[in-house]
UniProtKB/Swiss-Prot annotation:
Protein's UniProt keywords contain Transferase: yes
Keywords on record: Glycosyltransferase, RNA-binding, Transcription, Transcription regulation, Transcription termination, Transferase
Record-linked Pfam families: Pribosyltran (PF00156)
Name the UniProt record assigns to this protein: Bifunctional protein PyrR
Motif annotated as PRPP-binding, chain positions: 99-111
MF GO annotations: RNA binding; uracil phosphoribosyltransferase activity
Gene Ontology BP term (one): DNA-templated transcription termination
Length: 178
């Protein structure tokens, strides 16, 4: 049975707090781009950009990023053909930009590592920061977020689910014991 950690209002407050932190730490919003890790990270990145626009009256570009080809923990059963890496998957130029990488949950760090590899194949940003709605710990790699909505200590046998209205039809963050 899933236990609700954040409801929709709490999620929105966490994203608003992250938005203010981004503005403060960057002393403005010049040269920023948001890159959301598919799937829910894209929707969260769009929300951050919208909130930034409301606060600073500036349109911040948002792009989705599919990291599936860069994962080191997903195995392809047919090794006879190398996957084709699409270096043009971002519809924005990240070279010399400050990229805010956005994801829903930070766990082992492997998704973020894959995203960093993908970003490096697509350009040379001046800086990359990481924003996550939930940091649940249990890192396998030396990766830490710059902006966190909520730290949720979890056990390894628990799963954190983030639901966003745009994709799931409702909003919440739940934790489930497996």
């Amino acid at each position: 049975m899933a236990h609700e950690i954040l409801d929709g209002s709490s999620m929105q407050r966490a994203l608003t707090r992250i938005t203010y932190e981004i503005i403060e730490q960057n002393k403005g919003v010049d040269n920023l781009v948001f890159v959301g890790i598919k799937t829910r990270g894209v929707y969260l990145a769009k929300r951050l950009a919208k909130r930034l626009n409301q606060l600073e009256n500036v349109e911040i570009p948002v792009a989705p990023l599919d990291v599936s080809l860069y994962r080191d923990d997903r195995h392809v059963p047919d090794h006879t053909q190398e996957p084709t890496v699409k270096t043009d998957q971002l519809d924005i130029d990240i070279t010399n930009k400050h990229v805010i990488l956005v994801d829903d949950v930070l766990f082992t760090g492997r998704t973020v590592r894959a995203a960093l590899d993908a970003l490096m194949d697509m350009g040379r940003p001046t800086r990359i920061s990481l924003a996550v709605l939930v940091d649940r710990g249990h890192r396998e790699l030396p990766i830490r977020p710059d902006f966190v909505g909520k730290n949720i200590p979890t056990a390894m046998n628990e799963t954190v689910h983030v639901a966003v209205e745009e994709y799931d039809g409702h909003e919440d963050v739940t934790i489930e014991h497996n």
